[in-house]
Amino acid sequence: MEFVAGEYDIVVVGAGHAGCEAALACARLGLKTIVFAINLDSIGNMPCNPSIGGTGKGHLVREIDALGGEMGKAADATAIQVRILNRAKGPAVYSLRAQCDRARYKLYMKRVLESQPNLDIRQGEVCDILVEDGKVTGVKLTTGAIFRAKAVVLATGTFLGGRIIIGETVYDGGPDGMHPAKYLTESLKKLGIEMMRFKTGTPARVHRRSLDFSKMQIQLGDEVITPFSFEHETLEIEQVPCYLTYTTEETHRIIRENLHRAPLFTGLIQGVGPRYCPSIEDKVVRFADKPRHQVFIEPMGRDTEEMYVQGMSSSLPEDVQIKMYRSVIGLENVQIMRPAYAIEYDCINPLQLEATLQFKKIKGLFSAGQINGTSGYEEAAAQGIIAGINAAMYVKGKEMLVLDRSQAYIGVLIDDLVTKGTNEPYRIMTSRAEYRLILRQDNADLRLTEIGYRIGLISQERYEKFLKKKKMIEDEIERLKKTVIAPSDKVNKFLIEHGSSPISTGVKLSELLKRPELSYEALREIDPQRPDLPRSVKEEVEIEIKYEGYIKKQLQQIEQFKKLENKKIPEWVDYNQISGLSTEAKQKLSQIRPASIGQASRISGVSPADISVLLIWLEQAKKGSK
């Protein structure tokens, strides 16, 4: 029997990484919010790799933190190993990654949600989204309970129509043994929402005592730990090692001999899998010339003996999995605790969303995370905080937040989804960002804290601390540009010792710092007036000065980008009536309805000639309206 069980400003459906950020953002902005989880023990769960960050993903986590989100703090609180990746490649692509304690991460996030004012947490399965006159009005649970709301955020992860596949064994299921959300897909279809079917997979979890670490390479964390959250200057933790090993020719033989039983190749799996996280059977087929593949053995936490076998996700039958894992170096006697599996799930075509993550056709309905066709905890959380902020702004009748491609990786991620769409699980990568020298992980606070403060997610105390840091950076850069180092025996001895050319006339410290062989830390020896600064400030100063020329060039490119972004296209435009546009452009522009000429230019199938036609039409339309 149906009954009204509660009235809220905002309902969030799902309490994974997207749902947690969305719910917290809404509640912290003063909106009465309720978040539903199929199982309260799944809040903040990591059903795959127990890690946060990585290439491109670390940038997202720091941006979430700069806006006032929780993921960075949760990762810092539960990290068991921290490393910065890509150190050899330069600061634009430095990426922070933390191995986290999976159980403690979930507990941390659940506790944060439970203690958050304005936020209720409820176990239950949402089966229906209620809509009247093109506006969302609430949700219905399988029990018949109705929760009225002014806005709803969908953050269902991989639960929608979830189907678990292990070889020939197939059953309905969600991640980590949870039951799936069986009914919501039909509700979304009835609302005219176009659905897609994707697939992802996860490797086996194995018992620590069954592994021979003496045959593997130990991988330690960084000696000096960089935290994810800008609220933490340092992080002191006892780190746990990870291990690197390899598959063998025997591994590949076992896989090849059992491809006739691999669901990926028998047609049992219909969903499209992630290109950048292929299963081991996919890797063996696609890269047949490779004699071995890397395998990382990673602990699941401090209080468990479970180890995660990264690089070997699979949907092969369990009997094949046992042979396959035991053929890996150091895993000869491995004891599998949880078998690898693939999961198929329903998601939406993200082209149905505005850049605010609100559905174009249903006001007040927002969507975030894997339901939007992405893969990864960080991508989900990034969408979650934006969907949460915008659901709150929608309810308050205020302007919604859209970050563009020059402001944040979050902007790149969302723009890619709503402009280009995706036909496979989308993951962020540094190569997707045109302005990556500006969008570094170290300066995420400088880029986004002002926005977080203006919205209301950054406290006054944190904002003042941020302004103090910003001033320290500006003052030190100015000091280095004004301080002239005169030539002397001591100075030239120092320069020669560091493989640098001696000087014969006075040189500014900033110019010396631009020399690739000289670091900010090394220059302390000939810089007696140097102030004592926090590590994060020193890092920022060094990057800003060393890459000043490149940064200026990229800022000029951003100016050109902004010009096209600022040429807005009215919502009422009928593209079919614009002569000169190609048929494909008319179809794509009508479907996506870009907000600006800049966005239109990024749509696949819209040519530079089509953009010229659009620009001329806009000018004529302007003149005609005057």
From Swiss-Prot:
Cofactor entry: FAD
Source superkingdom: Bacteria
Gene Ontology cellular component terms for the protein in this record: cytosol
Keywords recorded for this protein, A-Z: Cytoplasm, FAD, Flavoprotein, NAD, tRNA processing
Gene Ontology molecular functions: flavin adenine dinucleotide binding
Localization per record: Cytoplasm
Pfam families: GIDA (PF01134), GIDA_C_1st (PF21680), SAM_GIDA_C (PF13932)
Coarse class of the protein's main subcellular location: cytoplasm
PROSITE patterns in UniProt: GIDA_1 (PS01280), GIDA_2 (PS01281)
SUPFAM superfamilies (UniProt xref): FAD/NAD(P)-binding domain
Keyword DNA damage: no
Record-listed FAD binding positions: 14-19
Record's subunit section: Homodimer. Heterotetramer of two MnmE and two MnmG subunits.
Summary of the function given for this chain in its UniProt record: NAD-binding protein involved in the addition of a carboxymethylaminomethyl (cmnm) group at the wobble position (U34) of certain tRNAs, forming tRNA-cmnm(5)s(2)U34.
Family designation: Belongs to the MnmG family.
Protein's recorded name: tRNA uridine 5-carboxymethylaminomethyl modification enzyme MnmG
Organism, scientific name: Caldicellulosiruptor saccharolyticus (strain ATCC 43494 / DSM 8903 / Tp8T 6331)
Lineage: Bacteria, Bacillati, Bacillota, Bacillota incertae sedis, Caldicellulosiruptorales
